[in-house]
Amino acid sequence: MKKFKWCLWLTGALFILMTAPSLNACSLVGETIPQNRTKEQYEFEKTFEPMFNFLEQEQKDFNGLEAYNSRVYIKNGDEVKRYEIDLGITKADGKGDYRIQIGENKKTVPVSYSNGKLHYDSEIDPLFDEEILNLVIKRDVFDSLNVKRTLRTGTTELSEIIYQPENNSDLFQKLKSKYDLPEETTCQIRIDYSDKTNYGITIQLTSKEMSVKIGLTIIKKRG
């Protein structure tokens, strides 16, 4: 009987030793850390889930939001263009302003937003790109990117992830085509989180002669 118990104990010990390496490969039960993330990066990225969830939505859900901002900056040689939508949110709809700046010329018109569409109080040209306003980015786009740098500051409550530049994703190809950017263009994505309510993404497309920066910010209601 003692010999049987000793063999049973030895079998259990060997099992633990054999399974230990596989257990170390997981940060949490049922969760495997991707090969292109450290454990710290993987856990840190989870704090940006509200932004990832919003970006995945085909039909944007503004419930629980206080404000939404969408902007595009285009620099082509010496020419600079800025387009920005700034919305305050009431229930699922938004009201705010559309601002254009082309060179030194500026114009602002009131706008409202409902059911994925912008409505302008007066004529303006060009209209804001609603594909950018309702930009959809699936989570696997972020999962495929390598992390270049992370930042977390206690003084300003700012958290940030900067991903390595890339030029292969479907998102990049789509935006490169939209803005007629040259082949040598690269794309870099940054996401940020601050003040416990503000989430943002910046997509920077850069070539020798041209630069396009797309930014989205959501501000969640407190409480």
Map each language-model feature to its residues.
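Acidic, glycine-rich flexible loop segments
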Residues: 144-190
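Sec-dependent bacterial lipoprotein signal peptides
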Residues: 1-24
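An acidic-aromatic
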Residues: 80-129
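Flexible, processing/modification-adjacent segments and terminal tails
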Residues: 112-157, 163
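N-terminal leader/targeting segments and the immediate start of mature chains
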Residues: 19-71
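Secondary-structure transition/turn motif
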Residues: 99-107, 123-127, 162-170, 204-210
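Short, solvent-exposed coil/turn segments at beta-strand boundaries
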Residues: 60-66, 86-97, 156, 191-200, ...
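Gly/Pro-enriched, hydrophobic low-complexity segments
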Residues: 170-223
